[in-house]
Amino acid sequence: MDNKNSDVEDFHREHDWLFSLVTDPEGKRFSVPKTGAQRQRDMHEAMARTADFLAFADNPEAQFPAVHVTGTSGKGSVSMMVGAMLQGMGLRTGLHTSPYLQMPTEKLMVNGCAVSLAGFAKLVRQFRDVHASWGAADGVYNRLRYTEAWTAITFMWLAQQNLDFAVVEAGMGGRLDPTNLMPSELAIITNVAFDHVKSLGPELTDIARHKAGIIKQNKPAITAVTQPELFAILEQEAAEKEAKLYALNRDFSYEVHDAHTITVDAPFGRYERVKVGPVGRYQLGNAAIAIAALDVLVGHQKLAGPINTAALANFSCPGRMEQVSRKPLILLDGAHNPHKMRALVESLKDAFPEKKITAITGSIVNKEVADILQVLVPAVDRIIATAPNVPGKPAVDPAIIQETVAQLSTIPVSTAPDVRTAVDEAMGLAGPDELILVTGSLYLVGEARELWYPVKE
């Protein structure tokens, strides 16, 4: 067997073991219907289990300087932008984002390169050894769950990379997300809107409290939250932790010149006519907070300037307004909550005001599908409903999406059993000057991306 095939087999073996933590030791899924109180209790337990393991593993989360990013929308893009600029400044930069589109190795990046298959397998084996010793130590806990294990693996890996900085995207919420066990030099809170309501809600103020939780004692934070009631929650958290909070429209602002150019008045400097790569207009706000965030790090002497904003000129974000075909024009965008969908629709109107749009959409259960469709449907001319294939996460029946669309509009709507069939159908229906959009779920976009960028290659 050659080394490449051996690496692939090792990768799959170790990833299969990691994924086995999705179930309990009896093989049952942890993800079952729960009340809000049960979900809160589970999140507290996840924090306690992960903290216990990290202490046993010599606290890898404390062994690198970090920027922590949360928010309902834009946190992945902002994380990537901050990472790109840090790398452009010659700094060895680690990046963790979640979820991945096609390969789990995407979640572990250094200077734009994902961990290798062999490196991933080795890392999981290292984790398994520590996990086994921890489990046998007769402590309170003896087994991490999948998300907790991923967090621990991420911290172990980042600690091994001799980084100048790490940028870590929170998974869900913030306060009770296991990534929040990591000390950070800066907290970034992009915005607060409705998402993961059953776990973080029910009110926007509840969600804001979860996001505010990533603010650390005596460490700066920055936010683009502007709603007074929600901003007050962040401000109170910062005051309690004696942390300086920098706010959009108070401490920093930005001006949009065109679809790819902004000027940012940051807390400590002004950044004139910054070019932002071929991305949707909604990414300009993300670029502004990313620039202001690094400006704050420089201002607090945690980073030596100048900031390399030129790194944003060629910035692209897989699965966000990503073009994969020209004739017909096909875009992939993982907008999966109403807030993200509104931003996507505005960008489409701005960039393609005259194009007819066929949207392929699908979602996993527990997403606000009806609310998302209320935003999407008026902006498109045809919908093909399908279902992402995600192990352990049931998808919304495409027939339900079809029925919802029919209640909202008279546009043509059909169903397809999978994304490949949906894309084939869309390409048969759409004219050469029309636009095909795959959206509604990052999982769906990841599957669609496989049609143009096969993992095997």
Please give the residue ranges for each predicted region.
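Active-site-proximal loop/hinge segments that shape catalytic or ion-binding/gating pockets
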Residues: 441
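Acidic, Mg2+-coordinating active-site environments of NTP-dependent enzymes
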Residues: 134-138, 161-169, 184-273, 287-306
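Beta-strand->loop->alpha-helix junctions that form or flank phosphate-binding loops
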Residues: 96-99, 224-225, 237-256, 276-281, ...
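ATP-dependent carboxylate-amine ligase catalytic core
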Residues: 7, 28-47, 52-55, 59-63, ...
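C-terminal helical cap/extension that packs against the catalytic core
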Residues: 227-242, 329-330, 338, 373-435
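Nucleotide phosphate-binding/pyrophosphate-handling subdomain across enzymes
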Residues: 165-170, 177-180, 184-188, 192-196, ...
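Hydrophobic anchor at the beta1->P-loop junction of P-loop NTPases
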Residues: 67-71
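Hydrophobic positions on the alpha1 helix immediately C-terminal to the Walker A/P-loop
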Residues: 77-81
